[in-house]
From Swiss-Prot:
SUPFAM superfamilies linked to this entry: C-type lectin-like
Species whose genome carries this gene: Bitis arietans
Keywords: Disulfide bond, Hemostasis impairing toxin, Secreted, Signal, Toxin
Function field: Interferes with one step of hemostasis (modulation of platelet aggregation, or coagulation cascade, for example).
Keyword Flavoprotein: no
Name of the protein: Snaclec 5
Subunit text: Heterodimer; disulfide-linked.
MF (Gene Ontology): toxin activity
SMART domains: CLECT
Compartments it resides in: Secreted
């Protein structure tokens, strides 16, 4: 009887420690969880605008992936490691009057950047030769695979 109570108490501690860590939600089939978001890599090749529209149709509040930290960048790099191409992310140039600023398409602030040295900002892709960690600009009309991200 004492072992049963000890085992039950242990399971309760494990359950309580997992709640609130992201383990209390489930992403749709074929999507992967990281933090409080769900991610999915798509091998279809689309323009940046087509990929963004596709992501918005796939998930509630979905967008091309925004990358907020080196840890998230590493997660996304692993997610797309089997794809042999540039990968669209949700960062692009926005011109406001004479100013040029880069913004994530989901409205989040750009707090982490990893542009390849010397690159100007247009639409951004993850570069395969960098293990999908460096960002390179490319024409927004070119067709590439992409990663969608949505809140869990």
């Amino acid at each position: 009887m004492g072992r049963f109570i000890f085992l039950s108490s242990g399971l309760l501690v494990v359950f309580l420690s997992l709640s609130g860590t992201g383990a209390d939600f489930q992403c749709p089939s074929e999507w992967s969880a990281y933090g409080q978001h769900c991610y999915r890599a798509f091998k279809y090749e689309k323009s940046w605008a087509e990929a963004e529209k596709f992501c918005m149709e796939q998930a509630n509040d979905g967008h091309l992936v925004s990358i907020q930290s080196i840890k998230e960048a590493n997660f996304v790099a692993k997610l797309v490691s089997g794809i042999i191409a540039y990968i669209w992310i949700g960062l692009r140039d926005r011109r406001k009057e004479q100013q040029c600023t880069s913004e994530w398409n989901d409205g989040s602030k750009v707090t982490y950047v990893n542009w390849r040295e010397g690159e100007s900002q247009m639409c951004q892709v993850l570069a395969i030769w960098s293990g999908f960690k460096n960002w390179v600009n490319t024409d927004c009309a070119s067709h590439n695979p992409f990663v969608c991200k949505s809140p869990a």
